Amino acid sequence: MCETMDFFERYKNLKEKYEEKKTKPKVIVVGRSNVGKSTFVRLMTGRKDIRVGKKPGVTLKINEYDMGEYILVDMPGFGYMAGLPKKVQEKIKDEIVHYIEEHADEIAAAVQIIDTKSFFEIVERWKGRGEIPIDLEMFDFITDLKISPILVANKMDKIKKEEWDAVLDGICEYLKCQPPWHQWKFIVPAILKEGKGIEEIKKKILERVRLFKKLRGIE
């Protein structure tokens, strides 16, 4: 949650723990299926061979891309995936959690992408079943590990422009971050299919990567 996100202190601790380790930082990309992760990775890497589709569950394995200063890690989508048994979906989710836990000390930032249009409906549906909404669970998991988040509120074109602030403030409330959303520098509204928001995301990634490297003594 927002009140516990002391990432600067975490970076200082990592410098001592990894004084001799000179690996590139990782930046992970997480999100439910069909929120725009593959589109984001294509924009970041410039690769045309990354599959993008309307059906959930296009990415089913962990993929790593060397971005020069850091490694971009594209995680499979979690939650509903078309054509996959629930048991397989749970296995994929477990693999995501295991990877993040195992590599937490190497991760400079986590880019979590959400579908802004469906976010509220899905959260309320899960809460109505007495379950923790998966988007909120992932955000809590990331921040509990003291990994610096970048929350990409994608598909903002589905929201009326005059409602953007109210919608983003509402997301803050679900994340237990006091509105207004502008004060939280980790939130980026985006329309990834049009490339909107990508430059701001790149900027935030590099800020976190360079701070991470500086405090760990990595050239």
Swiss-Prot record:
Superkingdom per UniProt: Archaea
Sites where the protein binds GTP: 31-38, 57-61, 74-77, 154-157, 189-191
Binding positions (Mg(2+)): S38, T59
Protein's UniProt keywords contain Transport: no
The entry's keywords: Cell cycle, Cell division, GTP-binding, Magnesium, Metal-binding, Nucleotide-binding, Septation
GO BP annotation list: cell division
Reported cofactor(s): Mg(2+)
Signal peptide (from-to): none
Domain EngB-type G: 23-211
Gene3D superfamilies attached to this UniProt entry: P-loop containing nucleotide triphosphate hydrolases
UniProt xrefs under PROSITE patterns: G_ENGB
GO terms, molecular function: GTP binding; metal ion binding
SUPFAM superfamilies: P-loop containing nucleoside triphosphate hydrolases (SSF52540)
Record-stated family: Belongs to the TRAFAC class TrmE-Era-EngA-EngB-Septin-like GTPase superfamily. EngB GTPase family.
Function recorded in the entry: Necessary for normal cell division and for the maintenance of normal septation.
Protein name: Probable GTP-binding protein EngB
Taxonomic source organism: Methanocaldococcus jannaschii (strain ATCC 43067 / DSM 2661 / JAL-1 / JCM 10045 / NBRC 100440) (Methanococcus jannaschii)
Lineage: Archaea, Methanobacteriati, Methanobacteriota, Methanomada group, Methanococci
